[in-house]
UniProtKB/Swiss-Prot annotation:
SUPFAM superfamilies: FdhE-like (SSF144020)
Key words, A-Z: Cytoplasm
InterPro entries associated with the record: FdhE-like_sf, FdhE_C, FdhE_central, FdhE_N, Formate_DH_accessory
A single MF term (Gene Ontology): ferric iron binding
Keyword Cytoplasm: yes
Function: Necessary for formate dehydrogenase activity.
Taxonomic placement: Bacteria, Pseudomonadati, Pseudomonadota, Gammaproteobacteria, Enterobacterales
Pfam families xrefs: FdhE_C, FdhE_central, FdhE_N
Source species: Citrobacter koseri (strain ATCC BAA-895 / CDC 4225-83 / SGSC4696)
Protein's GO biological process: protein maturation
The protein's name: Protein FdhE homolog
Entry's localization field: Cytoplasm
GO cellular component, one term: cytosol
Length: 309
């Protein structure tokens, strides 16, 4: 199954869904999203061997919250949604959509917000980014979108991505339409922007028991059934790994067919789990999966592969 976004003016003629149909997409709800992420990162930093880095990530998430409200985005995406729907493409496709200079404005605002909190190497990194030309910043953004991670140092990537993510999340929250599930493939990528997931979550509330993958760029969540590989869609050789026990709130779902894994967070086990924060705080599980010979099918926005990885 694939997911397509239907323009607002086409909803009535396609609206044959029943009231209890599974929502294929959950667009980002930006109110307090970054504050909640920052709080969770700080909470997880306690007694965690990666505590310092989690607190560093919390600073970036908090800065995103501040910049979000200082620089709201106004954009009419109606024409873009119609065009993308006709082409069967994600409306905010990272490989097609021209980038507005708004994202660089967000980056410089993030830097200004973070500078008083940074010191040492981290301060040097953002000062270097502050001096970079528009062309250099665009080249780094393009490299990240093309998964050419060797071209962007791993210490610069989180700052660049934080600005890009804020921009894409703002756009995603403005999409005037709804989603419809259709037959097709490639549900391993975000139906809104085409980026990768960071993790998946089995939710509570109105979507109780359903699994949604969380986009590492635009913050959209999309439904993928449980007990099925989110990367290759096979289900015959899946295994579940945890560091604690059967009731762990974080597990890794591995697939013997494609050799990858994706973490699953369970809100019913811990209602406070957060897609980005809990993924970053559980890198010990990633190390275990690497030892078992599996590769991540996701990328955390605060931890990009370095050269040679």
């Amino acid at each position: 199954m694939s997911i397509r976004i239907i323009p607002q003016d086409e909803l009535e003629k396609s609206e044959k869904r029943t009231a209890d149909m599974i929502p294929p997409l959950l667009f980002p709800r930006l109110k307090n999203l970054y504050n909640r992420r920052a709080e969770r990162l700080r909470e997880l930093a306690e007694n965690n061997p990666l505590g310092d880095y989690l607190r560093f990530a919390a600073l970036i998430a908090h800065a995103q919250e501040v910049v979000l409200y200082d620089h709201p985005l106004e954009m009419d995406l109606t024409a873009r949604i119609k065009e993308a729907n006709a082409q069967g493409k994600p409306p905010l496709d990272i490989h097609v959509l021209p980038r507005d200079k708004h994202w660089q404005k967000l980056l410089h605002s993030l830097i200004a917000e973070l500078k008083p909190e940074m010191s040492g190497p981290a301060l040097a990194v953002i000062e270097n980014l502050e001096k970079a030309s528009e062309q250099e910043l665009e080249q780094m953004a393009s490299a990240l979108f093309e998964s050419n991670f060797a071209s962007v140092s791993s210490d610069k990537a989180p700052f660049i991505w934080a600005a890009l993510s804020l921009y894409w999340a703002q756009m995603a929250s403005l999409i005037p339409g709804k989603a419809r599930a259709e037959y097709g493939e490639q549900r391993q990528y975000c139906p809104v922007c085409g980026s990768m997931p960071v993790s998946s979550m089995v939710q509570i509330g109105t979507t109780q028991g359903l699994r949604y993958l969380h986009c590492n760029l635009c913050e959209t969540e999309w439904h993928v059934v449980r007990v099925k590989c989110s990367n290759c869609e096979q289900s015959r050789d899946l295994h579940y790994w945890s560091l604690d026990n059967e009731q762990a709130s974080i597990k890794a779902e591995s697939c013997g067919d494609c050799g990858t894994y994706l973490k699953i967070l369970y809100q019913e086990k811990d209602p406070k789990v957060e897609a980005v924060a809990d993924d970053l705080a559980s890198l010990v599980l990633d190390a275990r999966m690497e030892q078992e010979g599996f590769a991540r099918s996701s990328i955390n926005p605060f931890l990009f592969p370095g050269e040679g990885e």
